[in-house]
Amino acid sequence: MIGLNHYLIVSGLLFCIGLAGMLKRKNILLLFFSTEIMLNAINIGFIAISKYIHNLDGQMFALFIIAIAASEVAIGLGLVILWFKKFKSLDIDSLNAMKG
């Protein structure tokens, strides 16, 4: 039987994969993907713990995170499209070209 430890290990591994993607990548789109992987790893952990302690708070919090992540993707992809139209690149290094 798959227990709480298995879910938490998978959650931790997914979070580490997302964190490694955030630290290694220079592409904005891949940074968004890494962020989504990290958020989904947190959701798996919340849902596993809430199922283990028989409390729905973790599941409700995971649903809230999914809603926030959806709005983040909508706004973020719009900004990425504008970024690509202006700089013809999705590299973070072109961020230095912005003046404000």
From Swiss-Prot:
User: What would be one Pfam family of this protein?
Assistant: Oxidored_q2
The protein's UniProt keywords, in alphabetical order, are: Cell inner membrane, Cell membrane, Membrane, NAD, Quinone, Translocase, Transmembrane, Transmembrane helix, Transport, Ubiquinone
Query: Where does the record place it?
Result: Cell inner membrane
Q: What is this protein's gene name?
A: nuoK
- Membrane spanning residue stretches: 1-21, 28-48, 64-84
What does the function comment of this entry state?
Answer: NDH-1 shuttles electrons from NADH, via FMN and iron-sulfur (Fe-S) centers, to quinones in the respiratory chain. The immediate electron acceptor for the enzyme in this species is believed to be ubiquinone. Couples the redox reaction to proton translocation (for every two electrons transferred, four hydrogen ions are translocated across the cytoplasmic membrane), and thus conserves the redox energy in a proton gradient.
**Documented EC number(s):** 7.1.1.-
What pairs make up the disulfide bonds? Answer: none
In terms of HAMAP family, this protein maps to:
NDH1_NuoK
What is this protein called in UniProt?
A: NADH-quinone oxidoreductase subunit K
**Source taxonomy:** Bacteria, Pseudomonadati, Campylobacterota, Epsilonproteobacteria, Campylobacterales
Q: Reaction catalysed?
A: a quinone + NADH + 5 H(+)(in) = a quinol + NAD(+) + 4 H(+)(out)
- Which Gene Ontology molecular-function terms are recorded? NADH:ubiquinone reductase (non-electrogenic) activity; quinone binding
Q: Per the record, GO CC terms?
A: NADH dehydrogenase complex; plasma membrane
Q: What class of enzyme is it?
A: translocase
